[in-house]
Amino acid sequence: SYKVSGGLHGVGVSVVNALSKKLHLTIHRAGQIHEQEYAHGDPQYPLKVVGETDTSGTTVRFWPSELTFSQTIFSVDILARRLRELSFLNAGVRIVLRDERVNLEHIYDYEVGLSEKSALDIAGLPGKLADCQEKDPALSELYLVEGDSAGGSAKQGRNRKMQAILPLKGKILNVERARFDKMISSQEVGTLITALGCGIGREEYNPDKLRYHKII
């Protein structure tokens, strides 16, 4: 898998390579340092050994192509949000973002991450949420019910136009007394956060994005 995996679905580095005017790889593996360089997706020379090492890891450097992108300056805010999401999903992985243009550094290091099925996953709304048809939050209601059986009854009796139903498993975590890492690892808390839509934390929380103005 090491030889064929290039990231998510095995295409990550391949796509970056194709969209870059230059991409340089430095790989520390099995006691050797390997290097290779590409220009607009084409290898400039075969993978070669340039030294010895007692560490492991890969450094990828790339320069976006002006032929493809009209804007090649990276947005630190976008990168910071994405890396923060990745740090939640990958417990124990330390991610460092440095912007050397302004001497800025962000460090993301969560001891307890989130599973891929957690509701903080960016995939979309929780699967058990029976959403309403109304798109205006001021006219939308969210009903929180305990258990799938109660959720089924509530879904049958609701007004589909304006009433959404979200079944939750059992008693939800008391977040007022819980540590932050325990809170975000709770599947039910994550489900609720995603359904409400306004995010969490000082950087991400935005009450204007609340999807329902009435929560019962």
From Swiss-Prot:
Belongs to the type II topoisomerase GyrB family. This is DNA gyrase subunit B. One of its GO terms (biological process) is DNA topological change. Keywords: ATP-binding, Cytoplasm, DNA-binding, Isomerase, Nucleotide-binding, Topoisomerase. Its main location: cytoplasm. SMART domains: TOP2c. The record marks 171, 174 as: Interaction with DNA. Heterotetramer, composed of two GyrA and two GyrB chains. In the heterotetramer, GyrA contains the active site tyrosine that forms a transient covalent intermediate with DNA, while GyrB binds cofactors and catalyzes ATP hydrolysis. GO terms for molecular function: ATP binding; DNA binding; DNA topoisomerase type II (double strand cut, ATP-hydrolyzing) activity. PROSITE patterns: TOPOISOMERASE_II, TOPRIM. SUPFAM superfamilies: ATPase domain of HSP90 chaperone/DNA topoisomerase II/histidine kinase, Type II DNA topoisomerase. It catalyses: ATP-dependent breakage, passage and rejoining of double-stranded DNA. The keyword Cytoplasm applies. Residues 140-216 form the Toprim domain. One of its GO terms (cellular component) is cytoplasm. Few gyrases are as efficient as E.coli at forming negative supercoils. Not all organisms have 2 type II topoisomerases; in organisms with a single type II topoisomerase this enzyme also has to decatenate newly replicated chromosomes. It is found in: Cytoplasm.
